[in-house]
Amino acid sequence: MIEEIKEHVKRLLDEGTISGFLGLKDQHGTIVPHLYKTSDDLDDGFSIGATEGGAPARYPMASLIMTIATTYENGKVGVLLRGCDERALNELLRWNQIPEAADRIVRVGFACKKELAEAHECRKPFPDECIAGEKTEPVSNASLKELESMDVTGRLNYWLREFDRCIKCYGCRDVCPVCFCNVCTLEEDSLIRTGDLPPENPMFHLTRAVHMAGRCIDCNLCTEVCPAEIPLRTLYKKVAEIVNHG
């Protein structure tokens, strides 16, 4: 699959369709985002996130391309997208975050493997514009169903225990591909007191959860980066469901 994607991107660069490509690069065993400028650059560590003996590396590609596309003045720029990345990009477009650069973004999508889709309970593990990979079936959210089987008191106690582990690192906010506010509510001292660890329970996380309702694209990056391993994605999904459907 990686060779198929690489050759496709090389053609886009060589034909002048794009003048840059935001993808991933293996730098001494660490996968990082990288802006490729020429087709020859792709022969030096090009990656789609696979790591040796570990989970695939994932980044908020949509928010990264938003920054690049609005500042990159050398024509169109391509971007490597999973299904969740495409949903994030569509959400940023819906919120008018990249109006002047929207037509300069060329999507290069690929499908996630079944194992990754199942690990993240992905509802759509492939983008609409998919050039490589086998499209796998959506995965149901078993973790959400498990919580819904508890009574109200059980759910409350569960979340209070989870939130007590929070170290207020803001990792969930910083990695979120659709968190784009210039002024963050979570840094407003009138709402969330600064200096408190753990942050006020449950106000800190419920504030963010309500803020994400109608915007969360279900990528699970928040849970993946959380050093306290709080299942934030499950929280956001349920709050969004309540807000959207009552």
Q: What does each model-identified segment do?
A:
Residues 143-163, 181-246:
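Ferredoxin-type iron-sulfur electron-transfer modules in oxidoreductases and energy-metabolism complexes
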Residues 1-165, 173-178, 182:
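Iron-sulfur-associated redox domains of electron-transfer enzymes in respiratory
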